[in-house]
């Protein structure tokens, strides 16, 4: 979508093939990301269903055996504390009416609906992958038509032939709009991921703090009314929280859809209106976008999204550093750390893909002769088309695994050169777990959070029930 015409026909062909190569890889990466998320979500749903059935069986067994009087329910189907573990004496009355099975079933159903209706990070990544997929498909189609079907590429539609020159509609001008729409949508969805994760970090800290205070107050109440008060308050709170969160999540979801799809579509339409045909008498006619319109409708939203995503990522990192000192849950710390690592990778991807394009645009924008560098144009066009495949690699944490692999390889090489064979063997056993890049470190591997190398980020739904200590 360059606004200059200083490059030759051969130069534009080279740039076009670079974009086609990068877009082809991005199609593979975008489809792979969507498939992996869908598979992981199915596995998570089956796992949660099994856990709910097991919890329901335990509740029914406790009710039938009469031993449920020693169980204090703290959260819906997720955490239970024994009165013996809390050093609280059981109620002095001989027996009481336990919680009916129907209430347990109702709570399980509410939790299931609540989890399904939560706005999840994996859902945001799917939309980001769809936007990358559309951008790649449009990029390949437009570039191939420009190179091999140029007569149809610049052919003006009959309905617009009698209009002004800048308003001529062709495949070329429409292509500028749809490519711009898709790429702008990727900017907005990347920003949406960082904003949503930051909001979840804040809300999870607040909810956990309130839940802990309420649990302590409820446990310190009169032992005779302790269980009834907790059950009644939690049932009422679960219903109210479900209704409120359901409404708020629907509003948030619709807002994100509007911002990340509708607004980019409007901006893409502006790019179409700002496109014009140039070099009609050359061997490879093409169309360009007015530099001012391109700045306002494309690069200005890009700059805003880059700055905002960086800002929210820094806030999340700062928030995590503060919460880490006060949090005693190692599993929660590991989960939050993985979320931040992948968010940083997504930020790095969008910076790597679009900073060269920004540099190229502003060089031509402020130069008098619309100066362009062929090598910079090829790099920027190729890398920006690779956003989908780079997001896919970030989703798999390939970069971190490669770094760990080469670090361990260096340690292994140093250990082999050491004269102390015992220390060498110990270091090798500590540094390697399976000896390949598709495995985690051998030290302190959390089976619950590191079961599968390929499916990590899709588990970071960060629902309130998931972030509590189990």
From Swiss-Prot:
Residues 38-123, 198-253, 317-342, 394-470 are cytoplasmic. One of its GO terms (biological process) is adenylate cyclase-activating G protein-coupled receptor signaling pathway. Glycans are attached at residue 162. GO terms for molecular function: G protein-coupled receptor activity. Gene3D superfamilies: Rhodopsin 7-helix transmembrane proteins (1.20.1070.10). It is a multi-pass membrane protein. The chain crosses the membrane at residues 17-37, 124-144, 177-197, 254-274, 296-316, 343-363, 373-393. Keywords: Disulfide bond, G-protein coupled receptor, Glycoprotein, Membrane, Receptor, Transducer, Transmembrane, Transmembrane helix. GO terms for cellular component: plasma membrane. Coiled coil: none annotated. It is found in: Membrane. Disulfide bonds join 172-287. Residues 1-16, 145-176, 275-295, 364-372 are extracellular. It comes from the Eukaryota. Receptor for cAMP. Belongs to the G-protein coupled receptor 5 family. This is Cyclic AMP receptor-like protein D. The gene is crlD.
